[in-house]
Curated annotation (Swiss-Prot):
Described purpose of this protein according to its UniProt entry: Component of SEC61 channel-forming translocon complex that mediates transport of signal peptide-containing precursor polypeptides across the endoplasmic reticulum (ER). Forms a ribosome receptor and a gated pore in the ER membrane, both functions required for cotranslational translocation of nascent polypeptides.
Assembly and binders: The SEC61 channel-forming translocon complex consists of channel-forming core components SEC61A1, SEC61B and SEC61G and different auxiliary components such as SEC62 and SEC63. The SEC61 channel associates with the multi-pass translocon (MPT) complex. Interacts with TRAM1.
Residue numbers carrying N-acetylproline: 2
Protein name stated in the entry: Protein transport protein Sec61 subunit beta
Phosphothreonine: modified positions: 9
Lipid-anchored residues (S-palmitoyl cysteine): 39
Any one GO BP annotation for this protein: retrograde protein transport, ER to cytosol
The entry's keywords: Acetylation, Endoplasmic reticulum, Lipoprotein, Membrane, Palmitate, Phosphoprotein, Protein transport, Translocation, Transmembrane, Transmembrane helix, Transport
Origin species: Mus musculus
Transmembrane segment boundaries: 71-91
GO cellular component entries: endoplasmic reticulum; endoplasmic reticulum membrane; endoplasmic reticulum quality control compartment; membrane; Sec61 translocon complex
Membrane topology classification: Single-pass membrane protein
Amino acid sequence: MPGPTPSGTNVGSSGRSPSKAVAARAAGSTVRQRKNASCGTRSAGRTTSAGTGGMWRFYTEDSPGLKVGPVPVLVMSLLFIAAVFMLHIWGKYTRS
């Protein structure tokens, strides 16, 4: 190549190893990583969950969707477990 590229990066023309080239560029680089990135997402997550009610909106009257109480959920889950149990026993006897 006749001279340095306008962007200042040399791709494949350097005699140095890539790790040394990256280390040399990183040492003099003006681009910095944001230090408050993790704190910002945590505080943003906290404010959004506190502002909208978070999980508690699931149990309020204004939440969209089907309203099912805890007793029907318990009954349906026990019926599902019983049905799986009966199918398991029925499959054992019809197989042998």
